[in-house]
């Protein structure tokens, strides 16, 4: 049993602007099973969904062992660019409900554990007593 305490950081995402969204990218060239690749190819997010993901997500200062213990990982991501508070960030959203922003000097990690995020991911947050199958792409 692990309890994660995070400092609460308030963000107002009214001034976020999505500049670029790349197609989903499958990151497991050695996995010859077409199932995961097909799921990844079907996964699409638009600008309003990306804004919603970040507005619902919790922010983490580092990718700690504790954070990685709470979320799964899937070999699929959607990357792009955004501006927040007049600062340009590269973002990467993993299909298993985690994300990160980087400006080359600083990296911010995100995890979306709220049910409102589930339909936007292939593998939603597993901490509510299920693993997989809750996203919009059913196994």
Functional labels for PLM-detected ranges:
Residues 38-97:
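Mature extracytoplasmic domains of secretory-pathway proteins
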Residues 92-99, 113-118:
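A short, sequence-level motif marking secondary-structure junctions
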């Amino acid at each position: 049993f692990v309890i994660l305490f995070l400092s609460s950081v308030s963000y107002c995402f009214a001034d976020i602007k999505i500049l670029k969204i790349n197609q989903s990218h499958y990151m497991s060239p050695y996995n010859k099973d077409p199932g995961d690749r097909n799921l990844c190819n079907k996964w699409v997010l638009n600008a309003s969904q990306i804004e919603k993901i970040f507005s619902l997500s919790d922010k983490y200062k580092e990718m700690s062992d504790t954070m990685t213990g709470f979320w799964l990982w899937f070999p699929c991501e959607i990357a792009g660019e955004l501006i927040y508070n007049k600062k340009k960030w590269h973002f990467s959203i993993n299909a298993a409900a985690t994300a990160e922003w980087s400006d080359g000097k600083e990296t911010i990690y995100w995890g979306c554990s709220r049910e409102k995020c589930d339909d936007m991911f292939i593998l939603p947050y597993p901490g509510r007593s299920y693993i997989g199958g809750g996203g919009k792409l059913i196994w």
